[in-house]
């Protein structure tokens, strides 16, 4: 953590988006703490620069896989910092984050994936990967987990 804050391939979508505010705060607040999480009893902290770097890397990975403006991104995971970074990464590319309950059974997700025409999904763990692999043949657009 702690490299370059902005990637020139990320479009500027305006001052009022979550991703734009993260990048602006990274420039203004840099090393100051942006978010903290207690994991296994130990507090973890990320600076604004760290968060912007994570969001930029996620956005770069999504873009490399073909994620473009207007795409919907399913996000399935615990209520943790990386989940929110996925929201911002999607929005930084002009995409739409679609959060889904991680405890939903696979069959319950099929409708959402098809109705929202979701092509991409970011998931927290192997359990969620397995769930999506199980329903992938029934999800008309899903192509990247």
Residue spans for each PLM region:
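Amphipathic alpha-helical recognition patches that constitute DNA-binding helices
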Residues: 17, 72, 108
């Amino acid at each position: 953590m702690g490299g370059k804050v902005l990637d020139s391939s990320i479009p500027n979508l305006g001052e009022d988006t979550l991703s734009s505010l993260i990048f602006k705060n990274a420039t203004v607040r840099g090393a100051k703490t942006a978010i903290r999480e207690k994991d296994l009893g130990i507090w973890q902290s990320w600076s604004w620069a760290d968060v912007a770097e994570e969001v930029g890397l996620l956005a770069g990975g999504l873009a490399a896989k073909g994620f473009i403006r207007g795409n919907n991104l399913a996000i399935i995971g615990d209520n943790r910092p990386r989940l929110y970074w996925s929201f911002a990464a999607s929005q930084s590319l002009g995409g739409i984050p679609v959060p889904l309950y991680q405890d939903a059974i696979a069959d319950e997700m099929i409708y959402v994936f098809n109705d929202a025409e979701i092509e991409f999904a970011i998931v927290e763990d192997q359990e969620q990967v397995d769930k999506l692999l199980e329903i992938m043949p029934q999800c008309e657009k899903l192509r990247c987990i």
